[in-house]
Amino acid sequence: MKNVVIVDCIRTPMGRSKNGVFRHTRAEDLSAHLMKGLLKRNPSVDPNDIEDIYWGCVQQTLEQGFNIARNSALLAGLPQSIAATTVNRLCGSSMQALHDASRAIMVGDAEICIIGGVEHMGHVPMNHGVDFHSGLSKSVAKASGMMGLTAEMLGKMHGISREQQDAFALASHQKAHKATIEGYFDSEILPMEGHDENGALTLVTHDEVIRPETTLEGLAALRPAFDPANGTVTAGSSSALSDGASAMLVMSEEKANELGLPIRAKVRSMAVSGCDPSIMGYGPVPATKKALKRAGLSLDDIELFELNEAFAAQSLPCIKDLGLLDVMDEKVNLNGGAIALGHPLGCSGSRIATTLINNMERTGAKLGVATMCIGLGQGIATVFERP
């Protein structure tokens, strides 16, 4: 089978979903901007050679409905010969898009693909139109569909205190702010136009969601968001609501060499896993272990991890059971995570993979893992290797 490589990976800045910079920008525009951007950054790629576009999106309705992958590609002016499909594995959608494209390339059904994902949570709320089957309650607790309560459950099972959660959330904002100041995000963010607080058109170059003013005292003052009586999970220790998109240019190793394109990372292995829906946030643990086994690697071989921070109460148990608590500051989410940057559902998978690859390049790391939890009890993971 063919080796699959990433030759470029980018994202939009992350905008706040409530009155943020992208409040007048549609999800298709966020997506089309990156599709065009990848081709502009890589002029040696003939767009007519692209086989397919795999684009993650969770809430596939309103402006995100009717195959947003194809709509965005047409909006971007890409050749009509390029196929496009929208992928939904909830929070893991755009990482699943990478997995789908990788398999097509591995078996020779494609040479070049674009993957990515988008979610405009300001325009299409997370729970818009959701109607769970009543019969699910026979086998799954109703609270399993309420992500905040699953985080409460997982945190309690692992003895995660409110203080630990607040400290983790503070660190996320501090690391993300430092990454912004130091320019660590510059190589992955493709600036695009949005609107400032006065409604004026402006070029957005940095993430709007990060709160550098965050303090432990401020976090400690927040009320529990999901379980008012006994809870420990607050808005401050949960992933922010944000709008954004991410994308990658993926191809066979042979094609990259033929075009003279730099190979930024190779897809070493991939995995998904299911887990108890009531502790959906634990999914990264079995998914990561499965991916490492397929790659013939151990946890000790991995130099950097990107773990999507759905909640601090969810992230810390995963970090603990992956044996990373003692090296968390050196190995996990060096630039912060979704608590600071937000979690635009369909965007996040390739977003964290993009950040991982950039951090691997910056630090000289050879092996890295991107992994995330998925609503209703799943996990997804990808092992990347730099040449």
Swiss-Prot record:
<comment type="subunit">
    <text>Heterotetramer of two alpha chains (FadB) and two beta chains (FadA).</text>
</comment>
<dbReference type="InterPro" id="IPR020613">
    <property type="entry name" value="Thiolase_CS"/>
</dbReference>
<feature type="active site" description="Acyl-thioester intermediate">
    <location>
        <position position="91"/>
    </location>
</feature>
<dbReference type="InterPro" id="IPR012805">
    <property type="entry name" value="FadA"/>
</dbReference>
<dbReference type="Pfam" id="PF02803">
    <property type="entry name" value="Thiolase_C"/>
</dbReference>
<dbReference type="InterPro" id="IPR020616">
    <property type="entry name" value="Thiolase_N"/>
</dbReference>
<dbReference type="InterPro" id="IPR002155">
    <property type="entry name" value="Thiolase"/>
</dbReference>
<dbReference type="Pfam" id="PF00108">
    <property type="entry name" value="Thiolase_N"/>
</dbReference>
<dbReference type="InterPro" id="IPR020615">
    <property type="entry name" value="Thiolase_acyl_enz_int_AS"/>
</dbReference>
<keyword id="KW-0808">Transferase</keyword>
<comment type="similarity">
    <text>Belongs to the thiolase-like superfamily. Thiolase family.</text>
</comment>
<protein>
    <recommendedName>
        <fullName>3-ketoacyl-CoA thiolase</fullName>
        <ecNumber>2.3.1.16</ecNumber>
    </recommendedName>
</protein>
<keyword id="KW-0276">Fatty acid metabolism</keyword>
<comment type="pathway">
    <text>Lipid metabolism; fatty acid beta-oxidation.</text>
</comment>
<dbReference type="InterPro" id="IPR050215">
    <property type="entry name" value="Thiolase-like_sf_Thiolase"/>
</dbReference>
<dbReference type="InterPro" id="IPR020617">
    <property type="entry name" value="Thiolase_C"/>
</dbReference>
<keyword id="KW-0012">Acyltransferase</keyword>
<dbReference type="GO" id="GO:0005737">
    <property type="term" value="C:cytoplasm"/>
</dbReference>
<dbReference type="GO" id="GO:0006635">
    <property type="term" value="P:fatty acid beta-oxidation"/>
</dbReference>
<dbReference type="GO" id="GO:0010124">
    <property type="term" value="P:phenylacetate catabolic process"/>
</dbReference>
<comment type="function">
    <text>Catalyzes the final step of fatty acid oxidation in which acetyl-CoA is released and the CoA ester of a fatty acid two carbons shorter is formed.</text>
</comment>
<keyword id="KW-0443">Lipid metabolism</keyword>
<keyword id="KW-0442">Lipid degradation</keyword>
<keyword id="KW-0963">Cytoplasm</keyword>
<dbReference type="GO" id="GO:0003988">
    <property type="term" value="F:acetyl-CoA C-acyltransferase activity"/>
</dbReference>
<dbReference type="InterPro" id="IPR020610">
    <property type="entry name" value="Thiolase_AS"/>
</dbReference>
<feature type="active site" description="Proton acceptor">
    <location>
        <position position="343"/>
    </location>
</feature>
<feature type="active site" description="Proton acceptor">
    <location>
        <position position="373"/>
    </location>
</feature>
<dbReference type="InterPro" id="IPR016039">
    <property type="entry name" value="Thiolase-like"/>
</dbReference>
